[in-house]
From Swiss-Prot:
One Gene Ontology cellular component annotation held by this UniProt entry: euchromatin
Residue ranges, annotated region (Tudor-like 1): 131-207
Annotated organism of origin: Xenopus tropicalis
Listed name of the protein: E3 ubiquitin-protein ligase UHRF1
Marked site (Required to discriminate between hemimethylated DNA versus symmetrically methylated DNA) residue numbers: N489
Location in or out of the cell: Nucleus
Region (Required for formation of a 5-methylcytosine-binding pocket): 466-469, 478-481
GO biological process, any: protein ubiquitination
Site (Histone H3K4me0 binding): C316
Single annotated GO MF: histone binding
Region (Histone H3R2me0 binding): 333-337, 353-355
Binding-site residues, DNA: A463, G464, D469
Amino acid sequence: MWIQVRTMDGRDTRRIDSLSKLTKVEDLRARIQQIFGVALESQRLFYRGKQMENGHTLFDYSVGLNDIVQLLVRQIPDSVPTKDKECGISDADSGCGSGQGESDKNSSCGEGATDVDGQPAGINSENVGPSLYKKNDLVDARDLNMGAWFEAQIVSVSKRVNPDGMSAEILDTSAASDDIIYHVKYEDYPENGVVQLTYKDVRLRARTTLPWHDLKVGQVVMVNYNPDEPKERGYWYDAEILRKRETRTIKEIYVKVLLGDAGDSLNDCRIRFVDEIYKIEEPGSAYITTESPQKRQNGPECKHCKDNPKRACRMCACYVCGGKQDPEKQLLCDECDMAFHIYCLKPPLSAIPQDEDWYCPDCRNDASEVVLAGEKLKESKKKAKMASASSSSQRDWGKGMACVGRSRECTIVPSNHYGPIPGVPVGTLWKFRVQVSESGVHRPHVAGIHGRSNDGSYSLVLAGGYEDDVDNGSEFTYTGSGGRDLSGNKRTAEQSCDQKLTNMNRALALNCSAPINDKEGAVAKDWRAGKPVRVVRNTKGKKHSKYAPEDGNRYDGIYKVVKYWPEKGKSGFLVWRYLLRRDDEEPAPWSKEGKERIKKLGLVMQYPDGYLESLASKEREKENKTEDELSESPSKGKRKRNSAGSGLSDAKSTPKKTKVESYKLSLDQKTLIKQDDLNAKLWREVMSFLKEGPKFLSKVEETFLCICCQEVVYEPITTECHHNICKGCLDRSFKALVHNCPACRHDLGKNYSLNVNKPLQAILSQLFPGYERGR
């Protein structure tokens, strides 16, 4: 097998050949050193987000054929300092740890450091001098994140100290100064603690409601507004009145909501609570005593229960029971922010844990399953059960193409699809069985029959077979599976017991248009009424059949089971035999018509990505090795020299590009394409690929791929921005309150109607018959 190694910046990509699934990571590093020239200790290898460590194999990391492994070159410092600089970056800072170290928590070099008494650094609480507000004054304080004003109380007042250590003097005692710091505490949010604000974000608490006739256009007032849900009660913002309108029944007022000093605003917002508009108090007005104020009404914190204390709510209270009692016994998950009573957990906790972070059972990650950077992989239970894990054989089984695994999967039709695969004509050739699996024609890598014992058989492969199998091309006898000891990791063995009509043998028998009979077999009265079976012939069948391909695997079309019966084979054991007969409209690939059609369609051998390059690289290595051996050995005679023009002639003699037969659309299909007006531009581009033959279907699949599920759209919704998405995918997006096009983020709106594009659905069903099954 071979893989691609790419540098982390993406500038250099090299292919590494002659690898195995059992290749050690340290051996891979040695190969990378030869090709990239990077020292072993400077290499960091990553595959699918995991850092590859020595001692493991490519199989342990599930590295597949032609997969990409990323190479990060580690920078090794010339000299390691003996002592870290003060406030320097430690080794833990460059690692992948998730927690904060004790040294970081106690460091005084970071931002927001505090003194011993808890007072922020650079703040002097002595000799503050005159200020606008005093301790215990009731004020409105602005939240710097959202720009809304909340009721608060001043806890203390302090003075900022200049960097030179001298206190800033207040020149005008009546004017506000940036050097005065107000320590305030929000009344409704004590959990936020004490917040430091300047005079711009603190003012006297609003207490005067303005009547309707006193509201003037251009006046700045305090209003209640909810930016997310304008029809609901929200928080208190400064706003400039834009216009007002009064009729006999309603009063309307539109404002520009001001969101802080940065200049951000929300224009043309309608205020619903016109009777609760407050005047902004000027500095120097009469102070409010602690006994007097009437609290303003804010929007509910919880949209589900509207802050009703008698109503159980799993959103704002305990996520298990919904109860709002015992708030001191509730734990808040640091991941999902849901609350849990300690006695509602399973198992319950006796006390609040002392850990800094706590995660609920749904969010908690098992520390034993987490693989940190630099750690070895955990043992896989699945791989531990494999025969290769307990085998004592030293044979390198990881070089075969049957072990590389699929690099892609056929999703155009489900795995239990009967009949042809759309876009795969009769006569298609593949070099390896794994490619046949990727195309969807025959999904198992090794097994000869693909099916289900309660449904039927979908495909089979004619490979080595049995000695007494008869292949007449359009009709052949096939011997069932089983009766062999394939324990361990064996692929084949001699017949050692009788076969039974179970598992895949029964699946193939179900394709016969006759009642199942596991004693004597059955014969179909109308063999064409049976279920279709896709048949692939392998080159290994050449020892028994002249119809097998010269190389690789070939798709030979649809066959039907005529009859099946038990009999004793040459081995002396009972085997089940099946007679299959061809029933396909496309000509057989060995016939004259079939050969002409293969030529017209331009069907040639298909190789895995990178296979030909790997093969050419091996040939060059052999040639170089041979030349080195010849140059080192003493010459006894003249060696024939290659002509100077031979290499050029080989390069010029490229095969002629054969003309491919165009893909033909039926009259009904052309009519449906014309009816699909919404996708007229896409169809014009797709129709230009008709002359490419089978590639036309690949272009259709690529063009009408749903961006959500990455499959051909089913029940397509063609949006107003001309993107095609499955109705189910778009419906799930709308249920998640995301009303944008998944492709371009165009706003579709909450009331967007999901109308299926019926002409597009009809043409896709004709081009890809059966693709809607399982969707």
